[in-house]
């Protein structure tokens, strides 16, 4: 079910890794950010979007991981955007993203996965300010909707996921820490932060998430075992081990 988190901003959470789809109302229509995950959930999101009575005019993907590159035909044949870096990686890795989507979620419209284009100068129909960084993935974007009091941060600042480095690329600790610094500045301009996975946070709650993420990264840098409540989930050990391996490669 869509939950309003700001003026003209709604979030729907998936049962898969607490993934958040965001709907933003603009003067021209609705923009969907990272809609997902299963075919049934995408269809339910389409039902709720229909009830808003406003047409979808665009989509936006915050980064080039499969669960942020999904779409449904009922949203319409409208432009779907990403940063130039994200669009390039998504296009090059489209086949792999399709495979991962099929293996992970039921009835995903595979033919619509990863069909994103570089965002035009000025943002086109996508509202707000795009904050691009290289933490977590190439061309990762946060969307600062200052007029709505909301910041969409993609796969950052989660209460359920540890920081996940972009394995295979050098300098990821520095890149992730720099990204956190930029997001910290943006948080001061909003009331609500929407992560790609996990609970929507009020501004006062975000400081604890920033502290937790920085403590985790510092433990990695020191080659120490992090003390992080998020790692009490057994399945978080896989991402943690990949982070460790990334620092050794």
Give, region by region, the residue ranges found by the protein language model.
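Conserved beta-strand hairpin/beta-sheet module of binuclear metal-dependent hydrolase folds
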Residues: 1-47, 51, 142-154
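Metallo-beta-lactamase
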Residues: 4, 30-31, 37-39, 51, 88-134, 138-209, ...
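Active-site metal-binding motif and surrounding structural segment of the metallo-beta-lactamase
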Residues: 40-82
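Short amphipathic alpha-helical segments
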Residues: 46, 71-74, 93-95, 165, ...
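Short, active-site-adjacent cap segments at secondary-structure transitions
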Residues: 67-68, 88, 200-202
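Generic beta-sheet signal
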Residues: 81-83, 153-154
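Accessory terminal helices/loops
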Residues: 184-192, 199-249
């Amino acid at each position: 079910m869509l939950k309003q988190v700001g003026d003209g901003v709604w979030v729907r959470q998936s049962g898969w890794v607490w993934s958040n789809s965001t709907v933003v109302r603009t003067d021209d229509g609705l923009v969907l950010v990272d809609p997902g995950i299963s075919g049934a959930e995408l269809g339910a999101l389409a039902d709720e979007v229909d009830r808003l009575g406003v047409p979808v005019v665009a989509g936006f993907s915050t980064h080039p991981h499969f669960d942020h590159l999904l779409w449904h035909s009922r949203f319409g044949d409208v432009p779907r955007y990403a940063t130039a870096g994200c669009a390039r990686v998504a296009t090059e890795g489209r086949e792999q993203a399709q495979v991962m989507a099929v293996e992970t979620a039921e009835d995903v419209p595979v033919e619509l996965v990863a069909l994103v284009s570089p965002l035009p100068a000025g943002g086109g129909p996508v509202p707000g300010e795009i904050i691009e960084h290289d933490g977590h993935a190439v061309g990762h974007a946060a969307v600062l909707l200052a007029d709505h009091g909301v910041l969409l941060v993609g796969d950052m600042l989660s209460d359920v996921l540890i920081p996940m480095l972009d394995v295979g690329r050098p300098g990821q600790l520095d890149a992730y820490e720099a990204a956190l610094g930029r997001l910290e500045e943006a948080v001061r301009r909003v009331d609500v932060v929407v992560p790609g996975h996990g609970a929507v946070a009020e501004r006062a709650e975000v400081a604890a998430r920033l502290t937790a993420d920085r403590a985790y990264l510092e433990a990695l840098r020191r080659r120490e075992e992090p003390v992080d409540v998020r790692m009490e989930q057994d399945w978080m050990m896989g991402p943690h081990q990949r982070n460790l391996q990334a620092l050794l490669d």
